[in-house]
Amino acid sequence: MQDALAVILAGGMGSRLSPLTDDRAKPAVPFGGKYRIIDFTLTNCLNSGLRKILVLTQYKSHSLQKHLRDGWSIFNPELGEYITAVPPQMRKGGAWYEGTADAIYHNLWLLSRNDAKYVVVLSGDHIYRMDYAAMLEEHKEKGAKLTVACMDVPVKDASAFGVMGIAENGLVKSFVEKPENPPTLPDDNAKSLASMGIYIFDMDVLKEALTEDAKLETSSHDFGNDIIPKLIDTESVYAYKFCGSKGRVDKDCYWRDVGTIDSFYEANMDLLEPVPPMNLYQSNWAIRTYEPQFPPARTVSSATGNEGIFINSIIATGVINSGGSVQHSIISSNVRIQDSATVVDSIIFDDVEVGEGSQLVNCIVDKHVRIPPNTQIGINKVEDAKRFKISEKGIVVIPESYQF
């Protein structure tokens, strides 16, 4: 992958994920007990052999930039390897990026300094495993100018995606961004072919397309709305079907957009399945992250003799359960569960204390929260709604550093 440059779009506001994104960018939101959302895209790059990576930041990027510094300063600049966070440079005016294509257009000066022949455009806020090297190989074999990764989705969900129509050889014939009435697959009226927001461009094609698009006042400067539909008419654009054993990744069809509280919660809970739909345990595709140096998790008996219990849960380092009960939950590092406290079907971020006798059910608790003894959350939604955000499916979210 020496001839390819990765550009990760990591500047979105993530407003639907509020309050988890009130003080951090969406790609920096903790996930799965020890990771950040962007770790999955970065790991895919690392394991695919991509060693030149630009991360385009924008919205409340401090937490994201700190994570990149602490956990991803692993490449060797002397060998031309790097992961570089790029905040808006304001080289073409004072406004923030207007769309996905506009974000890269404003940084064409960086692309021009690179001798890569191909650009891999990625999003920093999806959960999945994918070998981009296999996609690039197919891009080269077909002589494509643009390759779009895609997957089958139920037609009822397709309006949230760019939907494609393709020929038998994979040539893209049509592309409609978030259509009200999505076209279906020729052989399956219950499914549509959806773009995953993963693109491989020939460098010269991308530069020209972005430059021409920037001249159009009527453009939304977005890949799905503007760039891809136009390239279909002038260049060879191919689809790359995601799913199955491609490259070095074990068979894995898992891809999730965690853009809402409910989808974020469900993706975390997927990790607790007896056989998780996404394999985090493939030894040669380990998900890398920054790991704080805490001692191993432990359970201890409380003063009343209660034993700390973990059942079907993910527990990070530094956790101490002193006579509490944790069931079907994800507990991040340096959390304290006190005597007779119960945590069920919940996600607890770093540095949280669950007070003695407290009950948490169907909750997400952000960092640095001290839950007082005998507090009930997720039991009475009417009372919870007076203090906290509750998702459409009833997940209660306690914001970072909330004071009871």
Swiss-Prot record:
The alphabetized list of GO BP terms reads: glycogen biosynthetic process
- List the catalysed reactions: alpha-D-glucose 1-phosphate + ATP + H(+) = ADP-alpha-D-glucose + diphosphate
The family database entries (CDD domains) matched by this protein are listed as: ADP_Glucose_PP, LbH_G1P_AT_C
- Alphabetically ordered keywords of this record: ATP-binding, Carbohydrate metabolism, Glycogen biosynthesis, Glycogen metabolism, Nucleotide-binding, Nucleotidyltransferase, Transferase
User: Which Gene3D superfamilies does the record match to this protein?
Assistant: Hexapeptide repeat proteins, Spore Coat Polysaccharide Biosynthesis Protein SpsA, Chain A
**Pathway it works in:** Glycan biosynthesis; glycogen biosynthesis
**Does this entry carry the keyword S-adenosyl-L-methionine?**
no
GO molecular function list: ATP binding; glucose-1-phosphate adenylyltransferase activity
Its EC number is 2.7.7.27
Q: What InterPro entries does this protein's entry cite?
A: ADP-Glc_PPase, ADP_Glu_pyroP_CS, GlgC_bac, GlmU/GlgC-like_hexapep, NTP_transferase_dom, Nucleotide-diphossugar_trans, Trimer_LpxA-like_sf
Q: For alpha-D-glucose 1-phosphate, which residues are the binding ones? A: 97, 162, 177-178, 195
Its biological purpose: Involved in the biosynthesis of ADP-glucose, a building block required for the elongation reactions to produce glycogen. Catalyzes the reaction between ATP and alpha-D-glucose 1-phosphate (G1P) to produce pyrophosphate and ADP-Glc.
Q: How does it assemble?
A: Homotetramer.
Its family? Belongs to the bacterial/plant glucose-1-phosphate adenylyltransferase family.
Q: What is this protein called?
A: Glucose-1-phosphate adenylyltransferase 2
- Protein species of origin: Vibrio parahaemolyticus serotype O3:K6 (strain RIMD 2210633)
